A protein has these predicted regions:
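Hydrophobic packing and interface segments
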Residues: 1-186
Length: 186
């Protein structure tokens, strides 16, 4: 659960319009194409490193929690970290749906508004409505990115768990003898 929350925070930092990475990318966009590409690639690499550190920390924490036990218990602990992430599936799916809903609201707003009629009725209302829809779209994009981070994080944890099981079977020769495996064999 802590891994999912940490991945949400990291992803939000790198994708939300209020934080420094997006602001620096916006500034790079104003200076030219080359700086925009360089800044975008640099931010992509930086955000990847942050996510890897968070996922690696979660795996290390689960390994340290089961330290001193047989290797299969350690692998079980890593698998439980993945199960803990999947307990938030309902939240993740509802956050994932918010992005397309915000996009649809923006599209309906673009098709349904008559700028001249709105400005005649209430001056400045069209500009405010467009800004609200743009903000809603930005939040939708951020939540979509956060859910992708959770999906990737749980996939990494599952892959580590499956790989450790594969190594265990290869090391002892059969599934029946995994319980007798020692750390040296692993």
């Amino acid at each position: 659960v802590f891994l999912a929350v940490a991945l949400n925070k990291v992803t939000s930092y790198y994708t939300h319009t209020a934080h420094a990475p997006v602001k620096s990318l916006t500034k790079a966009c104003t200076t030219g194409h080359a700086t925009n590409i360089i800044e975008g690639i640099a931010l992509g690499y930086e955000s990847t490193v942050a996510a890897i550190v968070v996922i690696g920390g979660a795996i290390l924490l689960s390994v340290l929690t089961y330290a001193g036990t047989p290797p299969m218990f350690i692998a079980y602990g890593v698998a439980m970290a993945g199960i803990g992430m999947l307990t938030l599936t309902g939240n993740t799916i509802s956050m994932d749906v918010f992005g397309p809903v915000a996009d649809n609201a923006n599209g309906i707003g673009e098709m349904g508004y008559d700028p001249e009629a709105m400005e005649a009725a209430r001056p400045g209302s069209y500009r405010r409505a467009r800004q609200i829809l743009a903000d809603l779209d930005a939040v939708g994009n951020t939540t979509k990115a956060e859910t992708k981070g959770i999906a990737i994080g749980s996939a990494v944890i599952a892959a580590v768990s499956l790989f450790s099981s594969f190594i265990a079977v290869i090391a002892v020769g059969s599934e029946d003898r995994i319980g007798m495996m020692t750390v040296e064999q692993y």
